[in-house]
């Protein structure tokens, strides 16, 4: 006799592919099995939105992902799927929010007997992407202006949507309303992980869903205070470094690093020169080509979206008309390899910490469900949000979230938060600890839900 199953969908981010979520799946599977909640778990990593396809905009990416999930559920024969959890990494968190909105409305008959459980985002720009410069440093203002223009241009429809460039690219506002917000509210738990530093793609405030960012406010010079008692056990290396926001002190700055040697300066300058004159031009050309190609091949689907008929087409045979299926199966080709990711890591200190006194999960969850109303916010200025971001923030804050401010010591914390390049001896220990903590938190919540 087959048992009821819990489907866990893991969705990758911009410029990525499904392998970016393999490390997370591995740790989840191992941890949940150890906690006796893995027997009925099945994991699904959508594969049809790789590389340039992530430029196509949230709606088209979301429909493609929904098609894959629908087909998987339709064809699954080893039991009845009765529960659903979703994890989205970076842009994948936005795609996930679109997907569940359509899943529980336009495809309600397929999902009406499936109970939403956990919804998790890892470094997701819920409030879009915007660069703020409260310190007023002139070169940063010029740099941010250039990055804003580039980001909303060379990243295709997705880039314009991330920056909420205009009223025709306001999908992030829509995702905070109506069917999307209602679907999100049906999940028993919503969890948002946010990097406090070293994430050059998604700033803390937008991943944490807040209008206050101490790390931008003080140009990342604040001294961090970490939670001393971390729930969970069996961490292989160090404990995860979760920042105690309420303990941040505006008068306590991180110690200044010693002056670099000439050798280190030379190496840094060499890296900058290589990035500026070799990697950046290649990336710009490839992104430009990807943007152009994305615009051409998705034009007809955008017309279907604007005419309100795409969802009807998708519904046919679980969403596969010949036109759309042709697009879903069309391959752009991977012409940029992972070497351009530049995801070098540093080893963290304190590699043999022992979690001698565990903080009960209940206490941790209570604190970090209400952390956005904590005393820390009174110490720092509000960011100057435009009206769109104010609306998104207000709507998303109607729901309860467990928000985790995580510190990862790595050059590219954005990639390491899910170990998207895999886990080996070179993976930052703080990144592995973050993934282990995530898995243990989810295991506890699943136990609690049961």
Swiss-Prot record:
Positions annotated as active site in the UniProt record: 90
Transmembrane segments annotated in the record for this chain: 269-289
Outcome recorded upon mutating residue 90 to A: Partially abolishes the phospholipase activity towards PS and PA. Completely abolishes the phospholipase activity
Main location as per UniProt: other
One of the GO biological process terms: lipid catabolic process
Catalytic activity: a 1,2-diacyl-sn-glycero-3-phosphoethanolamine + H2O = a 1-acyl-sn-glycero-3-phosphoethanolamine + a fatty acid + H(+); a 1-acyl-sn-glycero-3-phosphoethanolamine + H2O = sn-glycero-3-phosphoethanolamine + a fatty acid + H(+); a 1,2-diacyl-sn-glycero-3-phosphate + H2O = a 1-acyl-sn-glycero-3-phosphate + a fatty acid + H(+); a 1,2-diacyl-sn-glycero-3-phosphocholine + H2O = a 1-acyl-sn-glycero-3-phosphocholine + a fatty acid + H(+)
Stimuli inducing this protein: Expression is up-regulated by the transcription factor RPN4.
GO CC, alphabetical: endoplasmic reticulum; lipid droplet; membrane
InterPro entries tied to this protein: AB_hydrolase_fold, DUF676_lipase-like, Lipase-like
Top EC category: hydrolase
A Pfam family recorded for this sequence: DUF676
UniProt short sequence motif Lipase-specific GXSXG motif, positions renumbered to this chain: 88-92
GO molecular function, one term: monoacylglycerol lipase activity
Residues in the signal sequence: none
Protein topology in the membrane: Single-pass membrane protein
Compartment annotation: Lipid droplet; Membrane
Record note on disruption phenotype: Leads to an altered morphology of lipid droplets with a smaller size.
Record keywords: Hydrolase, Lipid degradation, Lipid droplet, Lipid metabolism, Membrane, Transmembrane, Transmembrane helix
Note: Present with 1210 molecules/cell in log phase SD medium.
Protein family according to the UniProt entry: Belongs to the putative lipase ROG1 family.
Function: Phospholipase involved in maintaining the lipid droplet morphology. Has phospholipase activity with broad substrate specificity, acting on glycerophospholipids phosphatidylethanolamine (PE), phosphatidic acid (PA), phosphatidycholine (PC) and phosphatidylserine (PS), primarily at sn-2 position. It can later remove fatty acids from the sn-1 position of the produced lysophospholipids such as lysophosphatidylethanolamine (LPE). Also shows activity toward phosphatidylglycerol, but, in contrast to what was observed with the other phospholipids tested, prefers the sn-1 position.
Protein name, as recorded: Lipid droplet phospholipase 1
Species this protein is from: Saccharomyces cerevisiae (strain ATCC 204508 / S288c)
Gene field: LPL1
């Amino acid at each position: 006799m087959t048992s009821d199953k819990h489907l866990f969908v893991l969705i990758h981010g911009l410029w990525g592919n499904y392998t970016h979520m393999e490390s997370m799946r591995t740790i989840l599977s191992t941890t949940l099995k150890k906690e006796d909640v893995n027997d009925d778990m099945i994991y699904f990593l959508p594969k049809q939105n790789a590389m340039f396809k992530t430029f196509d905009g949230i709606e088209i990416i979301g429909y493609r992902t929904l098609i894959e999930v629908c087909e998987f559920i339709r064809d699954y024969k080893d039991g009845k799927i009765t529960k659903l959890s979703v994890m989205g990494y970076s842009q994948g968190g936005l795609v996930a929010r679109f997907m569940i909105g359509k899943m529980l409305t336009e495809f309600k008959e397929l999902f009406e007997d499936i109970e939403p459980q956990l919804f998790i985002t890892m470094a997701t720009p819920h409030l879009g992407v915007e660069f703020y410069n409260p310190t007023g440093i002139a070169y940063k203002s010029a740099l941010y202006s250039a990055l804003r223009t580039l980001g909303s241009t060379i990243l295709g429809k997705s880039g314009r949507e991330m920056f909420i460039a205009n009223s025709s690219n306001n999908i992030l506002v829509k995702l905070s309303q109506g069917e999307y917000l209602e679907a999100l509210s049906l999940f028993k738990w919503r969890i948002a992980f946010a990097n406090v530093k070293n994430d050059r793609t998604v700033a803390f405030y937008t991943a944490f869903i807040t209008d206050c960012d101490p790390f931008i406010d003080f140009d990342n010079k604040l001294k961090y205070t970490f939670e001393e008692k971390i729930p969970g056990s069996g961490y292989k290396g160090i404990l995860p470094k979760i920042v105690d926001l309420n303990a941040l002190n505006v008068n306590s700055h991180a110690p200044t690093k010693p002056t670099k040697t000439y050798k280190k300066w030379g190496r840094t300058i060499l890296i900058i020169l290589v990035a500026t004159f070799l990697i950046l031009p290649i990336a710009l050309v490839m992104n430009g080509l990807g943007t152009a190609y994305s615009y051409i091949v998705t034009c007809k689907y955008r017309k279907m979206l604007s005419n309100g008929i795409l969802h009807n087409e998708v519904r046919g045979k679980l969403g596969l008309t010949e036109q759309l299926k042709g697009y879903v199966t069309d391959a752009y080709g991977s012409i940029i390899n992972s070497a351009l990711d530049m995801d070098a890591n540093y080893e963290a200190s304190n590699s043999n910490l022992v979690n001698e006194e565990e903080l009960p999960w209940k206490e941790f969850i209570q604190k970090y469900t209400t952390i956005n109303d904590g005393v820390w916010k009174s110490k720092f200025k509000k960011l100057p949000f435009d009206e769109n971001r104010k609306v998104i923030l207000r709507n998303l804050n109607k729901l309860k979230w467990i928000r985790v401010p995580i510190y990862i010591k790595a050059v590219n914390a954005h990639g390491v938060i899910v170990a998207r390049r895999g886990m080996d001896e070179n993976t930052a220990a703080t990144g592995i600890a973050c993934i282990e903590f995530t898995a243990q938190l989810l295991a506890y919540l699943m136990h609690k839900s049961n």
